[in-house]
Amino acid sequence: MSLDGVWAPQTANIGDGPAKKASDQASMQTQVLQTASLKDGPAKRAVWVRRDNAETEDPVKSTMSKDRPRLEVTKAVVVDLGTGFCKCGFAGLPKPTHKISTTVGKPYMETAKTGDNRKETFVGHELFNPDIHLKLVNPLRHGIIVDWDTVQDIWEYLFRQEMKIAPEEHAVLVSDPPLSPHTNREKYAEMLFETFNTPAMHIAYQSRLSMYSYGRTSGLVVEVGHGVSYVVPIYEGYPLPSITGRLDYAGSDLTTYLMNLMNNSGKHFSEDHLGIVEDIKTRCCFVALDPIEEKKIPAPEHEIHYTLPDGKEIRLGQERFLCSEMFFKPSLIKSMQLGLHTQTVSCLNKCDIALKRDLMGNILLCGGSTMLRGFPNRLQKELSSMCPNDTPQVNVLPERDTAVWTGGSILASLQGFQPLWVHRLEYEEHGPFFLYRRCF
């Protein structure tokens, strides 16, 4: 299977004619990866990890016995835990092979069984159990983990039920969102090493992984996911947190706003129907290039029909494009934060002149919410309008909804990355702070 489309992605430049190959950009070398090149490609799919107490190839000085079992080759697992979905698969593949909802089910007290062996968390396909009344909960809030016990249940399901692997036999690469607390990384290490006994792990900056999926080492990553949005400047592999922008609105807010618009037009949806509204959003909604002109189009031309699960048919009109205006006018959802385009320009203006010029031409769009039809073109129009003396360039990939995972797949496959794995023996010997020597 050819992976050329992943390792040398065809990146479409909005408003700039034919797509350009991302690999034609400047040198693919980054200080973070030392000699690692994104052109190393899929040949480096197997990862050296210690089995049991095996030593790393470039070991940290240890007081323990030097008699180690030999290294064995195994495939690394890449996991991207988002607010909406958790995506996972083996490093070296172009797309994640497994994707489940991050929302889990907790039995209501009246339906929960008594005894110590009762199941407390239902994950993935277990949610479709008609015999148990479940309360849906999400262990993440705006991209940040708030319930680690539930996250552990999700990972247990991913490893054992979805991928059907023994986690103690595979290195694991995890994505970490921008501006997350440092304790996130330490908790990940504790869970992976002490609960799942993984032989090695690495935690990578989420926006950096998104950038790698484009084949770049510098760029302005504009990421709009399910629970939070970010605008992250990255230079030669290094994120710039001091000028990173975070917006606490994203795809879930779009779903809620769409539901409110439909209810205002006479339909009857509640929070119990959010799954249906999510499907309506994905199938029927779009982003208008010019909402004022779009409103002038006769209403019947906007109408389409959507069939509900019970067979009933509803008609959708202008709410199909009005809902997405919240990204550019957050006051519509009672948010005091900047619009996505304004936040993007704000981050660019905080950069020095040389860096700003580089980032202007490398605006990289990522996240599932950017998959709405018309989203890239609208953002391009807004940025060009706000920066008439510059040439902002929005770049898009067809698979940008899985950009974080794909970047992790690329990174974990690079030969030059292999010394950056944190091994269990090193964690046991030096503690969680050893993470910061390899994960930065």
From Swiss-Prot:
Keywords: Cytoplasm, Cytoplasmic vesicle, Cytoskeleton, Differentiation, Fertilization, Golgi apparatus, Nucleus, Spermatogenesis. Signal peptide: none annotated. Residues 36-56 are annotated as: Required for interaction with TES. Its main location: cytoplasm. Coiled coil: none annotated. Residues 1-29 are annotated as: Disordered. Disruption phenotype: Male mice are infertile with consistent head and acrosomal morphological defects in sperm. Sperms show a smaller head size due to total damage of the acrosome-acroplaxome-manchette complex. Exhibit disruption of acrosomal biogenesis with abnormal migration of the acrosomal granule and a complete loss of subacrosomal filamentous actin (F-actin) structures in spermatids. InterPro entries: Actin, ACTL7A_N, ATPase_NBD. Detected in testis. Detected at the acrosome of round spermatids (at protein level). Detected in adult and embryonic testis. Detected in developing male germ cells. CDD domains: ASKHA_NBD_ACTL7 (cd10214). It is found in: Cytoplasm, Cytoskeleton; Golgi apparatus; Cytoplasm; Nucleus. GO terms for cellular component: acrosomal vesicle; cytoplasm; cytoskeleton; Golgi apparatus; male germ cell nucleus; motile cilium; nucleus; protein-containing complex. The keyword Chaperone does not apply. GO terms for biological process: acrosome assembly; fertilization; single fertilization; spermatid development. Belongs to the actin family. Interacts (via N-terminus) with TES (via LIM domain 2). Heterodimer with TES; the heterodimer interacts with ENAH to form a heterotrimer. Interacts with ACTL9. Interacts with CYLC1; the interaction may be relevant for proper acrosome attachment to the nuclear envelope. PANTHER family: ACTIN. Essential for normal spermatogenesis and male fertility. Required for normal sperm head morphology, acroplaxome formation, acrosome attachment, and acrosome granule stability. May anchor and stabilize acrosomal adherence to the acroplaxome at least in part by facilitating the presence of F-actin in the subacrosomal space. May play an important role in formation and fusion of Golgi-derived vesicles during acrosome biogenesis. This is Actin-like protein 7A. It comes from Mus musculus (Mouse). The gene is Actl7a.
